Amino acid sequence: MIHQIRIYEIFENNKAAFHSRFRDHASRIMRSYGFDIIAMWEGKTGHRTEFVYLLAWPDEQTMHRAWERFRADEDWNKIKRLTKARHGDLVGTIEDRMLIPTSYSPAISRRRLDQH
């Protein structure tokens, strides 16, 4: 099992549109391709607003295949075009990291995340 963390710069002027798109469309389409979204957060770093989410994958190959299929999805690409035309860019820079647990790391579980 590996994890992936994605950090998106989002903009205050259209943050609500970003969250609507991710909640109502992106996460739904992602799940249809096997994405296992563990948790999602919003945070601030200085003046930058960020949307951060954690994914679980069985292996790196599965992760790459799922992302390829998601990015090629016709519904997703149509939604991106429509929301960009209506609200402008919803995402600035994107950081993407694959996380491989150390031998001494406690296991991540949804229950443990819910307790924090």
Residue map of PLM features:
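Accessory recognition modules or surfaces
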Residues: 2-3, 7-9, 19, 42, ...
